[in-house]
Amino acid sequence: MFVYGSIINPCPTEHVMSVLAISITTVALAEIGDKTQLLSLLLASRYRKPIPIIAAIFLATLANHALAAWLGVVVADYLSPDILKWVLVVSFLTMAGWILIPDKLDGEESISTRGPFVASFIAFFMAEIGDKTQIATSILGAQYADALSWVIVGTTLGMLLANVPVVLIGKLSADKMPLGLIRKVTAGLFLLMALATAFF
């Protein structure tokens, strides 16, 4: 059973780096072409104030993913390590297929008329609910319950890695990005991650 003190207890450096790398990579790849990345582009184009938008993305992701990872830990109490391993494999395979499906926002009306920080925080937090990056965070939390804080740090950094450049180049149109090719490459990487998890 998960012991909540493990959130802050030190882990071996090698394990921490492994969890951090997997968390960053998984979420950064899953975020490519995702609706929250498109939301970042929309927010940047609308407000043209990158600092409050990036701060809002950071805090919204931290809050959302902390909750998601904790829920994953709760589920992990009822699953064996072998089952968790194959849940992770299946999740990577699912991501490989999911990433190939173009995502879109529900509409600009979902963006608040408040200031850039408040509007970005609310919009980003709500957009993450049920999103594939949130689901991935829950699964990672279940798999690496002994290093939960590093899962949260890694998934948050992964979101920033994928979204900060989009905010900074918000003047560019998403139509000019080779999203089709990017999605295919990303799907291939998720497939490799699934194979590596299953057999190594």
Swiss-Prot record:
Q: Where is the protein localized?
A: Cell inner membrane
What's one Pfam family here? GDT1
- Please give one Gene Ontology molecular function term for this protein: metal ion transmembrane transporter activity
Q: What is its main location?
A: membrane
InterPro entries the UniProt entry points to: GDT1-like
Asked if the keyword Calcium belongs to this entry, the reply reads no
The protein's superkingdom reads Bacteria
Q: Which UniProt keywords apply?
A: Cell inner membrane, Cell membrane, Ion transport, Manganese, Membrane, Transmembrane, Transmembrane helix, Transport
Loss of this gene results in the following:
Mutant exhibits sensitivity to manganese but not to other cations. Under high-manganese conditions, the mutant accumulates high levels of intracellular manganese with a concomitant decrease in intracellular iron levels. Mutant also shows a small, but significant, increase in resistance to oxidative stress induced by hydrogen peroxide.
One cellular component (GO) term of this entry: plasma membrane
In the bilayer, the protein is annotated as:
Multi-pass membrane protein
What are the transmembrane regions? 13-33, 53-73, 81-101, 110-130, 150-170, 180-200
Checking PANTHER family in the record gives:
TRANSMEMBRANE PROTEIN 165, TRANSMEMBRANE PROTEIN HTP-1 RELATED
Report further notes.
Expression of mneA suppresses the manganese sensitivity of an E.coli mntP mutant.
Q: What does this chain do?
A: Involved in manganese homeostasis. May function as a manganese exporter.
Its family remark reads: Belongs to the GDT1 family.
Question: Which named protein is this?
Answer: Putative manganese exporter
Supply the source organism's classification: Bacteria, Pseudomonadati, Pseudomonadota, Gammaproteobacteria, Vibrionales
Q: Gene name?
A: mneA
